[in-house]
Every structure is written in C-alpha cells, then in structure tokens.
Amino acid sequence: MAEGTAQDAFLRIEGVSKSFGSFQAVRDVSLTVGKGEIFSLLGGSGCGKTTLLRMLAGFEEPSAGSIFLDGRDMAGVPPWERPVHMMFQSYAIFPHMTVEENVGYGLKHEKGLSKADRANRVAEMLDLVQLTPFAKRKSHQISGGQRQRVALARALARQPKLLLLDEPLAALDKKLREHTQFELMSIQARTGVTFIVVTHDQEEAMTLSDRIAVMDKGEVRQVGSPTEVYEFPNSRFVAGFIGSINTFEATVIARESPHLCLSVPALGTEVLARDVAVVAVGQAVTLAIRPEKLRISRERPEGANALAGTVRDLAYFGKDSLYRIDLAGGGMVQAHAVNARRGDEGARVADWDDTVFVGFDPASALVLVA
C-alpha cells in the first residue's frame, strides 16, 4: 500500500498533543498515513494509542496540533460528520437483531439511500465478509469470529474513508485470532479503505500492518514496516518491546570494516557486530541479539562470536525450543532452536546441563545507542 508523505498523505497528524488536567496522554505526535494503508498504533497500556484513535474519530479534541483527513482540517468537525467509522473491541452487536439487521443498522438514516439501495448494500457487505448464509441468525447463533465480521461489515456499510479498529481481535482465542487477521487483510485489500489499528499485541501488528508506529508514554518511538521495527529498532525500548531480545552493555573498542569490535563484560570476551556509522570508538552502546539469531552447537563453531556455556533451562514448544544458557563469561542468553528432527530428546539440539557453544553472525547483532 502507499506510504503517506507530508505532501500526499491521506491522513496527516501534525504535532498533536492531548492533556487531561496535568496529565499529558499524547505528546507532540506527527504521523502520515497513505490511502489504502493498514497502519497500526502499537504500545502497552497507557501509551496514548487509544487517546490518539479517539481524536481521529472526533471523540476527543487535541490540546495542540492538527489532524487533516483527505486534505480537510478536522478541527471542530463532530464525529458524525467525519468520513470515519470506529469498530470497538466489544463489537456492540445488537442481540435482538439478525445479522443483516445489524449490518444495515447504520444505513437507516443515511440521506439519499432508498430501501432497495440499503438492501443491496447490506447484501454486498454480507458477501464481502462471507456471512450471507447467516443473514437471518441472531448474534447468539453465530461464533465469536462471525460476530467480529458482523461488526466489520456494519462499519464498512457506510463506506467510510477511514476505519478505526480498537483492539479488534482481543476477544478471540489464539487460533481464531490468527485466522481472522488474514480475513481482515483480505477484506481491506478488496475495499481499499484505510485502516488504523490500535493493539498491544506485537504479533497482530506485525501480521496486519503495512507500517507500525510504536508508542510509549504518549510519544511515537519509531515508525516503520514490520521488518524495519523488528530487524532495525532505533532504541533499546523498541528492540525489547517488539519480540524477545538479549541485551548487554558494551563499549566500542575498534572499527574493523564492515564490523565493530565490542568489549562486552557480561560475555567475558570481545565480539564483532555490524558497523553503525553513528557510533565512535570508545563509546558506550548496547549489544542486542534476537534469540532466533543465535546458533547452538555441541562443537565450537569456526569464526568470531563463539561463546561457551551451559544449558540451565529449556522450554519445549513443539516446533521449536527456547534455551536459557549460562555463559562462561558470567552472562546469560536466551536462544531459539527449531526442532527439526522427530522424537523425544532427539528433537532437541541440547538438554539440561549440557555444555554447548552459542554463535551468531556479526550482521545479526544490533548496536543500539538509545
């Protein structure tokens, strides 16, 4: 999908802040979102993501800054006059109505829409979310995933330019949530409506989004594609919030292009990492390595970045295992390994109390300065 720029963005958020008394919920946020993009606001509880969503919907007015939607300044525009629909976490499906009545509820008072046109729009939405066979059923006669699709169809029926989704999949179990993520992506692609998704679930944001804004304490810490925020986080906070990561205090002791040589006291040795132009020799940094980037072996691997250690704990997840390894230098790392072989202990690369080596490619090591 198209990425918004300051000049052509479908949605522009410029220096927006929101205070409730002395508490500042959103701090000087500026974002651009392109037309037809799925854009996620990702963060923990209290980070300001829902407050920002409510300002987009018109339920809250910014204390400072401006919001432009499709070139129009939204200042003073009430919710019912905005080309925006909001889908809440609870779905708010009316239990006394059928599926088709729920979907068509918002169309009853739409000007210029005849009864026949309304029926056609409802039929079109039911077909879009694959609920035509369930049109006459009440909400208690369909599943949680189907209720979620009813809420989505109702939100899209009024043909909004922007759809705001507040934790849309939080009420679903894991398997249904994973399945529904792909349904949402398919429906969005067919309608072309711009989606803004609020979520605390990193996997959900990574799966759904064209781009993600990671928020903390009312501020946007990083904006980028799922690959960018995962593989190239710009701070220790983002690196730790998106997935699991091992972090160590380090010092740059040499630049050996294309690598940096780092002294890492917790590892008891020097290691090589990908060069980062913004750091200087002698600078204190953070070395960060994702668990899946580490390789566990019984024999010492060739090359740099080979660390000896002992397996102190492991968790078996079926397709892979997570190992906690105490290193000879005094530190500890977590490492993921795929269980490629079939069997009991034979499926794992190591067991409790085994002496192992942990290695990693210098290109897989992140050097963070914030």
Walk through the language-model features, giving the residues of each:
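Conserved ABC transporter NBD signature motif
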Residues: G65-D73
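ABC ATPase nucleotide-binding domain helices that frame the ATP-binding cleft
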Residues: T50-L53, V150
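Helix-to-loop junction immediately C-terminal to a conserved catalytic motif
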Residues: A57
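Non-catalytic connector elements of ABC transporters
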Residues: I245, R255-A370
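The feature captures the beta-strand-to-loop junction immediately N-terminal to the Walker
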Residues: L42-G44
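ABC ATPase nucleotide-binding domains
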Residues: I38, P79-G240
